[in-house]
Amino acid sequence: MIELKHLYKSFDGKEVLKDINASFENGKTNLIIGQSGSGKTVLMKCIVGLLTPEKGELLYDGRNFLSLKKNEKKLLRREMGMIFQSAALFDSMSVLDNVMFPLNMFSNDTLNDRKRRAQFCLERVNLTGEAHDKFPGEISGGMQKRVAIARAIALNPQYLFCDEPNSGLDPKTSLVIDELIHDITHEYGITTLVNTHDMNSVMGIREKIIFIHEGTKAWEGTKDEV
């Protein structure tokens, strides 16, 4: 579980986040939604440790991230999978090599085992062997997002953070990506946070939804309550 307790963040004396309180359960998909400038991106950056709040607590399964030592934060970050607004793939690497990249960096498995793991993750997002040898520039935007999801789950993360995962996608493909993230969350028991301004994403999210407005939590509920 991820818990936010009385988080505050300011830039140049202006409060961007004001007394944010929220909790995100394990094995659930959680949507953080708000207009551009609402503070949702700053909130996500605070949660993953890219920004440091001035006040409050950020708890990962009871551990206050803000109080951890540098090496402890590094170990915790290895339990995080990230999906960025752009797919952020390496253009010079094949689809398979993109997914193998974090495995090559952090896994002690043999090369064959790392390759099998990458292939398994790609097949889980419905990308079969023919696509594995292609390069990012040779596949569609929707397929690139699938590769990004496969790469994010390659190291079996406990937490999955998705920053505008539907950016640049048509509504039909966006819904497919939302449902894929949701299904993987439940399959692996991951705590997932999806950050977006797209109200259509609500249709693919079945758990908690938090609306951020002018740096505060304006509303919290489920899809059925929206």
Language model region names:
Residues 48:
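Helix-to-loop junction immediately C-terminal to a conserved catalytic motif
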Residues 160-163:
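Catalytic Walker B motif of ABC-type/P-loop ATPase nucleotide-binding domains
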Residues 171-173:
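Helix N-cap at the start of a conserved alpha-helix in ABC-type nucleotide-binding domains
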Residues 135-139, 143:
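Conserved ABC ATPase signature
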Residues 64, 112-130:
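Conserved ABC ATPase "signature" region
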Residues 156:
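Conserved catalytic motifs of ABC-family nucleotide-binding domains
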Residues 196-197:
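H-loop/switch region of ABC-family ATPase nucleotide-binding domains
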